[in-house]
Structure formats: C-alpha cells, structure tokens
Amino acid sequence: MPFELPALPYPYDALEPHIDKETMNIHHTKHHNTYVTNLNAALEGHPDLQNKSLEELLSNLEALPESIRTAVRNNGGGHANHSLFWTILSPNGGGEPTGELADAINKKFGSFTAFKDEFSKAAAGRFGSGWAWLVVNNGELEITSTPNQDSPIMEGKTPILGLDVWEHAYYLKYQNRRPEYIAAFWNVVNWDEVAKRYSEAKAK
C-alpha cells in the first residue's frame, strides 16, 4: 500500500493570522505531497519494504538498500515530520499544557516559560533548514533539533511536538524574521494532541 498525503484536520486558512492560508496550502499540497510521491517512487522496486510502517523504515535506515537510503531518509523523514506537524497545530490551540505533560515539563525545565524559551532557541538556532523538537527519550522529555528532514525517530527518540523551520514554512508571511514565526507558533499549538502523544510515547 503506497504512502498517502494525509488530509489536514482544518481548512488552510484556519491558522490565520499566525500561519497564513497560502503558506499552508503550498506547504501541504506541494511540499508534503512531493515527499510522499518521492518516497513511494523510492520504494517502487522494493515490494518487501512497501508493507513496512514509516517508523520501521526510519528507525533502521542502515538496513535499507544503499541505493534508496538517502531518498527514504529525506522523503520518508519529510513525510513523517509533516504528518506530525499538521496534527499538533490547531485553530483552537495556544495556551499551556495541563495534567501529566505540564507536570513533566515543569519537572524537566523548571517552568513552561523556561521550556518555551529553550525550545524557541533550538528553533531559532538551527542553521539553514531543519526542525526543533520536543521528544521522549528513554521516558524523559528532551529538546532537540535536526537538520533537513531528519526525524528524531532515526535516533530512537519519539517526537511529540515539532516546529518546521525550513523557509518554505514561513517565508511568504515572515520573510527572514524566523523569531516572529516561532513566537506565532505558540498561539496554534494543540496541547491536547501533544499530551496524547506524550502518554503514548511513555507507554512504549
């Protein structure tokens, strides 16, 4: 079964004014769609790999034939990263997490504000294209960043919150003002989804 572009759980203009409609449309229908198309093309001659999940492919890249390893890394990573990204955004987002996730953030980082500052620094400090992440690693929360479309899954970590800092994610609205885009991101974070992913990651 080929991989498919997931539908967005909200309209393209739902995240306005924080993330604009045109960016969301191009980002989803063009950029993400291209990763899916190229991933399927890379796997086309390898029926033994076509039934594997994205997580199975990305968590063991070394097991893949060398001829398709880079294509799966880049396009499979792009598909995984964006599939998560769309779900952790919401027009009803923002605010702060509650419950178990809030407790874990306070315990690890001292406060929600301190966590936001550290995550924002990871996003702003990622040179060139890449992502900032909140991951679960051995049951613990951790902030990390990855280059290009690399996924924390490749390092055995479980991403629960991600921010795309490729220029295609923000340039139409924010041009080179990445810190403004990062600040706007906090207004649309779907903390219920992040909390769900945290619970699932801890149960692994």
Swiss-Prot record:
Matching InterPro entries, A to Z? Mn/Fe_SOD, Mn/Fe_SOD_BS, Mn/Fe_SOD_C, Mn/Fe_SOD_N, Mn/Fe_SOD_N_sf, SOD_C_sf
A Pfam entry, by short name? Sod_Fe_C
Q: Which residues bind Mn(2+)?
A: H27, H82, D164, H168
Subunit description: Homodimer.
What's this protein's family per the entry?
A: Belongs to the iron/manganese superoxide dismutase family.
Protein name (database record) = Superoxide dismutase [Mn]
Q: Which residues form the signal peptide?
A: none
Q: Which organism is it from?
A: Geobacillus stearothermophilus
